């Protein structure tokens, strides 16, 4: 029999409904797995008491025939989401000891639907990073390893804890956020599925902000179906978030069986970047073949402003971050380092509380917003953002239903491999994903194969605004063709 923590979310839902096991049993199985996997450092804090109490409520609901959509399903929460009464840090020392008195909209909707909270998941500090190496609470280690090697690998970032926990069976699914690829890149690195919904599909209320015009919540899970189930509960209008869109939430799970017959899938020629590894190119071609064989038409398209996306993103995102992070001053919550006066306290607190990468991005953002540089950098980057959005609009107006690209330019790299490199080398991990955020579109990463060293590789599908259903249908087609990617033996247990 499959261990309870190794079930997919859909299988666990069906098993609980059939009373094959209890919510308490599956919660305990995951808590035991978390205890055995401390070496991965996927969780900043586990919440066993809360999990078991929530599971008991779920068992009572199931016994009465009152089960809700996610009844009794154990989930992990990225530590960027405010959770009432539970330590919430954004992976930063500056929020040490912070326990919110409120719950994020996304997590509250998961609890409304009966899900069980296992704990808070590790991440790059303030979601700034592509490797989960910048967390003040230690690096998260990927459960994957290269064949014949014990060298630790990164799980990707910033949602590295979410991706590692899902891949290692430490939760059935997890919340995550995506500002420039922080759901899709770690999902690709860990053989999991991650969707960044359309900007405005999920409320940002109660999520610690990085770059407000780019941030969007979404799920990471082990299958396309599991992601669809979770997004159905996470999405929805919230009047407390002015960017939240007031429109019905579709039945995402039903969409996975639609297939792709009659769809036109675009292949953007600009994504064939110089130096792309041959195995990434082969996988991309294979993905197009799978979709063609399932009845889709494959069409080469042009997204001419793609080359400007990454530099524009690394102007817009730090600019917004420098503004958002100005609120952390040691006065009302979190870390406080005394100074000779109030200005000294601000300076000392921020110097001690923020890590190196966060400081770098605050400084970049402050620079591009400063007098004399605002027009030259920030305004120009926003104009490029508009051009990128228009490129996608033109492709969709010409009849393209979704766009297929690689999710990442490589498989997972080793812990510390990029630590001393030029920061731009790390930023290049987002080369295939940032355009989606800049244009506010939905994008999904789905596992599609392994590289020569046995590490997962993912493909990305990009959709029309608020057409996540087509992405789920196409992603399910790829998942069916590629097969589920199984994690090798648990070396950490």
UniProtKB/Swiss-Prot annotation:
Domain of life, per lineage = Bacteria
Q: Spell out the GO cellular component terms annotated for this protein, sorted alphabetically and separated by semicolons.
A: glutamyl-tRNA(Gln) amidotransferase complex
Keyword NADP assigned: no
Q: What's its catalytic activity?
A: L-glutamyl-tRNA(Gln) + L-glutamine + ATP + H2O = L-glutaminyl-tRNA(Gln) + L-glutamate + ADP + phosphate + H(+)
Which Pfam family would be a valid example here? Amidase
List the NCBIfam families hit by this protein, alphabetically.
gatA
Which HAMAP family does the UniProt entry name for this protein? GatA (MF_00120)
- State the name under which the record lists this protein: Glutamyl-tRNA(Gln) amidotransferase subunit A
Q: Which organism is it from?
A: Methylorubrum extorquens (strain CM4 / NCIMB 13688) (Methylobacterium extorquens)
Give the protein's biological function: Allows the formation of correctly charged Gln-tRNA(Gln) through the transamidation of misacylated Glu-tRNA(Gln) in organisms which lack glutaminyl-tRNA synthetase. The reaction takes place in the presence of glutamine and ATP through an activated gamma-phospho-Glu-tRNA(Gln).
Disulfide bonds, which pairs?
none
What are the protein's UniProt keywords?
Answer: ATP-binding, Ligase, Nucleotide-binding, Protein biosynthesis
* Listed InterPro entries: Amidase, Amidase_CS, Amidase_dom, AS_sf, GatA
- Family stated for the protein in its record: Belongs to the amidase family. GatA subfamily.
Q: What are the EC numbers?
A: 6.3.5.7
Write out the GO MF terms.
ATP binding; glutaminyl-tRNA synthase (glutamine-hydrolyzing) activity
* Gene3D superfamilies listed in its UniProt record: Amidase signature (AS) domain (3.90.1300.10)
- Give the record's GO biological process terms: translation
